[in-house]
């Protein structure tokens, strides 16, 4: 890859970031990051796994203080609830409320399902190549701690 090709790739990444930041229209006071956190909790709950702040931090690659702030905001909006782990009361588990689960279904599952239908012509091979390219871009980014 030469510098001009890299520039085109980075332009596409910028466009992709804008797509993620603007879709879909969310309720007042809800940010895309809130939906990402709700989705992580949902995915863990579906697999009957427990979810802690550290799980969200690791999955979304964001700092613990950032996750703590998002969790507080979601709890204030009654989208999640905190529970103490039975064996260790110091460990706080996160659970979706019915309202939180409804948000995931509407703003993630249904939305992604409809969007995926519109992208049915993209092959698994094309998708895997795109994922590999973006992953490689992240891994080789100068100044990024891996």
PLM regions: where:
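N-terminal leader segment of winged-helix/HTH proteins
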Residues: 1-32, 39
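Terminal interaction helix/tail motif
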Residues: 7-12, 109-146
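Key DNA-contact positions within bacterial/archaeal DNA-binding proteins
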Residues: 35, 65
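Pre-recognition alpha-helix immediately N-terminal to the DNA-recognition helix
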Residues: 36-42, 102
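Short, hydrophobic-biased segments on the C-terminal half of alpha helices
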Residues: 53, 71-72
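The alpha-helix within a helix-turn-helix
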Residues: 57
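Charged, amphipathic alpha-helical coiled-coil/dimerization segments
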Residues: 72-129
């Amino acid at each position: 890859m030469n510098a001009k090709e890299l520039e085109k790739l980075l332009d596409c990444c910028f466009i992709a970031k804008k797509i993620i930041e603007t879709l879909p229209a969310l309720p007042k006071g809800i940010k895309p990051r809130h939906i990402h956190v709700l989705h992580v909790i949902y995915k863990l709950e579906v697999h009957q796994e427990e979810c802690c702040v550290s799980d969200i931090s690791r999955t979304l690659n964001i700092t613990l203080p950032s996750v703590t702030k998002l969790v507080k905001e979601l709890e204030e909006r009654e989208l999640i609830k905190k529970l103490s782990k039975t064996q260790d009361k110091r460990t706080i588990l996160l659970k979706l409320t019915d309202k939180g689960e409804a948000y995931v279904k509407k703003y993630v599952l249904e939305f992604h399902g409809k969007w995926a239908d519109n992208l049915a012509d993209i092959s698994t091979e094309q998708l895997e190549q795109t994922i590999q390219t973006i992953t490689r871009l992240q891994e080789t980014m100068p100044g990024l701690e891996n």
